[in-house]
Amino acid sequence: MKTMDLQELEKRFQEKIDKEIKIEPNDWMPDEYRKTLIRQISQHAHSEIVGMLPEGNWITRAPNLRRKAVLLAKVQDEAGHGLYLYSSVETLGADREATIDDLHSGKAKYSSIFNYPAVTWADIGTIGWLVDGAAIMNQVALCRCSYGPYARGMVKICKEESFHQRQGYESLVTLCN
Protein backbone atom coordinates (compact mmCIF):
# COMPACT_ATOMS: atom_id res chain seq x y z
CA MET A 1 0.00 0.00 0.00
CA LYS A 2 1.39 3.40 -0.92
CA THR A 3 1.93 6.00 1.78
CA MET A 4 -0.62 8.30 0.16
CA ASP A 5 -3.18 5.51 0.19
CA LEU A 6 -2.61 4.96 3.89
CA GLN A 7 -2.80 8.68 4.57
CA GLU A 8 -6.08 8.89 2.67
CA LEU A 9 -7.53 5.96 4.65
CA GLU A 10 -6.46 7.58 7.91
CA LYS A 11 -7.98 10.87 6.82
CA ARG A 12 -11.32 9.23 5.95
CA PHE A 13 -11.27 7.32 9.22
CA GLN A 14 -10.68 10.52 11.20
CA GLU A 15 -13.44 12.30 9.29
CA LYS A 16 -15.89 9.57 10.35
CA ILE A 17 -14.75 9.90 13.95
CA ASP A 18 -15.08 13.69 13.82
CA LYS A 19 -18.61 13.40 12.40
CA GLU A 20 -19.50 10.81 15.07
CA ILE A 21 -20.20 8.16 12.44
CA LYS A 22 -19.81 4.70 13.94
CA ILE A 23 -16.92 2.55 12.78
CA GLU A 24 -18.22 -0.88 11.77
CA PRO A 25 -16.34 -4.21 11.59
CA ASN A 26 -15.82 -4.11 7.81
CA ASP A 27 -14.61 -0.49 7.82
CA TRP A 28 -10.93 0.26 7.52
CA MET A 29 -9.38 1.25 10.85
CA PRO A 30 -5.82 1.94 12.01
CA ASP A 31 -4.05 -1.00 13.64
CA GLU A 32 -3.59 0.89 16.91
CA TYR A 33 -7.33 1.65 17.07
CA ARG A 34 -8.11 -2.05 16.52
CA LYS A 35 -5.54 -3.18 19.12
CA THR A 36 -6.82 -0.69 21.68
CA LEU A 37 -10.41 -1.81 21.16
CA ILE A 38 -9.45 -5.47 21.46
CA ARG A 39 -7.64 -4.79 24.73
CA GLN A 40 -10.42 -2.59 26.17
CA ILE A 41 -13.37 -4.73 25.12
CA SER A 42 -11.70 -8.00 26.13
CA GLN A 43 -10.84 -6.53 29.54
CA HIS A 44 -14.48 -5.47 29.88
CA ALA A 45 -15.66 -8.95 28.86
CA HIS A 46 -13.29 -10.57 31.37
CA SER A 47 -14.62 -8.27 34.10
CA GLU A 48 -18.21 -9.27 33.33
CA ILE A 49 -17.33 -12.98 33.52
CA VAL A 50 -15.11 -12.74 36.62
CA GLY A 51 -17.72 -10.45 38.19
CA MET A 52 -20.21 -13.32 38.18
CA LEU A 53 -18.08 -15.42 40.50
CA PRO A 54 -18.64 -13.74 43.89
CA GLU A 55 -22.39 -13.55 43.26
CA GLY A 56 -22.62 -17.01 41.74
CA ASN A 57 -21.30 -18.43 45.00
CA TRP A 58 -24.37 -17.01 46.75
CA ILE A 59 -27.09 -18.45 44.52
CA THR A 60 -27.62 -21.48 46.76
CA ARG A 61 -27.33 -19.37 49.93
CA ALA A 62 -29.66 -16.49 49.05
CA PRO A 63 -31.98 -15.65 51.96
CA ASN A 64 -35.20 -16.54 50.13
CA LEU A 65 -36.55 -17.80 46.83
CA ARG A 66 -37.21 -14.32 45.43
CA ARG A 67 -33.64 -13.19 46.14
CA LYS A 68 -32.32 -16.43 44.66
CA ALA A 69 -34.31 -15.86 41.45
CA VAL A 70 -33.12 -12.24 41.21
CA LEU A 71 -29.49 -13.23 41.80
CA LEU A 72 -29.73 -16.05 39.27
CA ALA A 73 -31.10 -13.59 36.69
CA LYS A 74 -28.29 -11.16 37.46
CA VAL A 75 -25.56 -13.78 37.09
CA GLN A 76 -27.17 -14.88 33.83
CA ASP A 77 -27.20 -11.26 32.62
CA GLU A 78 -23.51 -10.85 33.48
CA ALA A 79 -22.66 -14.00 31.53
CA GLY A 80 -24.59 -12.61 28.58
CA HIS A 81 -22.70 -9.31 28.83
CA GLY A 82 -19.40 -11.16 28.74
CA LEU A 83 -20.44 -13.26 25.76
CA TYR A 84 -21.75 -10.24 23.88
CA LEU A 85 -18.48 -8.41 24.50
CA TYR A 86 -16.41 -11.42 23.41
CA SER A 87 -18.45 -11.40 20.20
CA SER A 88 -17.61 -7.72 19.74
CA VAL A 89 -13.91 -8.55 20.12
CA GLU A 90 -14.29 -11.23 17.45
CA THR A 91 -15.66 -8.63 15.02
CA LEU A 92 -12.24 -6.98 15.31
CA GLY A 93 -10.48 -10.15 14.20
CA ALA A 94 -9.46 -11.41 17.64
CA ASP A 95 -9.82 -15.07 18.54
CA ARG A 96 -12.15 -15.66 21.50
CA GLU A 97 -10.21 -18.66 22.77
CA ALA A 98 -6.92 -16.76 22.65
CA THR A 99 -8.55 -13.86 24.48
CA ILE A 100 -9.77 -16.18 27.23
CA ASP A 101 -6.37 -17.91 27.35
CA ASP A 102 -4.82 -14.48 27.95
CA LEU A 103 -7.14 -14.06 30.95
CA HIS A 104 -6.25 -17.47 32.35
CA SER A 105 -2.52 -16.88 31.91
CA GLY A 106 -2.68 -13.49 33.64
CA LYS A 107 -1.65 -11.60 30.51
CA ALA A 108 -5.08 -9.96 30.28
CA LYS A 109 -6.63 -7.97 33.11
CA TYR A 110 -10.08 -7.54 34.64
CA SER A 111 -11.55 -5.19 37.23
CA SER A 112 -9.73 -5.82 40.51
CA ILE A 113 -12.84 -5.12 42.62
CA PHE A 114 -13.82 -8.75 42.03
CA ASN A 115 -10.75 -9.97 43.93
CA TYR A 116 -12.41 -9.01 47.22
CA PRO A 117 -14.51 -11.73 48.90
CA ALA A 118 -18.27 -11.49 49.26
CA VAL A 119 -18.66 -13.11 52.68
CA THR A 120 -22.14 -11.88 53.62
CA TRP A 121 -25.43 -11.30 51.86
CA ALA A 122 -24.89 -7.57 52.51
CA ASP A 123 -21.76 -7.82 50.33
CA ILE A 124 -23.93 -9.09 47.49
CA GLY A 125 -26.34 -6.17 47.90
CA THR A 126 -23.40 -3.77 48.01
CA ILE A 127 -21.93 -5.22 44.82
CA GLY A 128 -25.26 -4.67 43.13
CA TRP A 129 -25.87 -1.17 44.41
CA LEU A 130 -22.39 0.36 44.46
CA VAL A 131 -20.20 -1.70 42.12
CA ASP A 132 -22.84 -1.91 39.41
CA GLY A 133 -23.68 1.75 40.06
CA ALA A 134 -20.05 2.71 39.50
CA ALA A 135 -19.98 0.55 36.37
CA ILE A 136 -22.98 2.43 34.99
CA MET A 137 -21.20 5.74 35.57
CA ASN A 138 -18.19 4.47 33.62
CA GLN A 139 -20.14 2.66 30.91
CA VAL A 140 -22.83 5.15 29.89
CA ALA A 141 -20.24 7.10 27.90
CA LEU A 142 -19.38 3.90 26.02
CA CYS A 143 -22.88 3.93 24.52
CA ARG A 144 -21.55 6.78 22.37
CA CYS A 145 -18.13 5.29 21.59
CA SER A 146 -16.89 5.23 18.01
CA TYR A 147 -17.02 1.46 17.47
CA GLY A 148 -20.57 0.47 16.49
CA PRO A 149 -20.82 -3.08 17.91
CA TYR A 150 -19.44 -1.96 21.27
CA ALA A 151 -21.66 1.13 21.44
CA ARG A 152 -24.82 -0.85 20.62
CA GLY A 153 -23.94 -3.56 23.11
CA MET A 154 -23.37 -1.00 25.82
CA VAL A 155 -26.91 0.35 25.45
CA LYS A 156 -28.31 -3.07 26.36
CA ILE A 157 -25.70 -3.70 29.05
CA CYS A 158 -26.32 -0.34 30.76
CA LYS A 159 -30.07 -1.00 30.91
CA GLU A 160 -29.46 -4.34 32.59
CA GLU A 161 -26.86 -2.88 34.96
CA SER A 162 -29.49 -0.34 36.06
CA PHE A 163 -31.75 -3.27 37.02
CA HIS A 164 -28.86 -4.83 38.95
CA GLN A 165 -28.20 -1.59 40.79
CA ARG A 166 -31.87 -1.27 41.80
CA GLN A 167 -31.93 -4.86 43.04
CA GLY A 168 -28.76 -4.32 45.09
CA TYR A 169 -30.21 -1.19 46.66
CA GLU A 170 -33.49 -2.96 47.45
CA SER A 171 -31.60 -5.86 49.01
CA LEU A 172 -29.68 -3.53 51.34
CA VAL A 173 -32.80 -1.56 52.29
CA THR A 174 -34.49 -4.85 53.20
CA LEU A 175 -31.52 -5.80 55.39
CA CYS A 176 -31.70 -2.43 57.17
CA ASN A 177 -35.39 -2.79 58.06
Place the predicted regions along the sequence by residue.
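Alpha-helical scaffold segments that form or flank carboxylate-/histidine-based iron centers
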Residues: 33-44, 62-81, 124, 149-161
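Helix-loop segments that flank and shape redox-cofactor active sites
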Residues: 27-33, 51-73, 134-151
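Acidic/His metal-coordination segments adjacent to aromatic residues that form catalytic metal sites
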Residues: 22-42, 102-128, 145
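Conserved alpha-helical segments that form or flank metal/cofactor-binding pockets of metalloenzymes
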Residues: 2-13, 69, 74-102, 168-176
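Extreme N-terminal leader/anchor segments
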Residues: 1-29
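Internal, conserved structured core segments that host functional sites
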Residues: 112-167
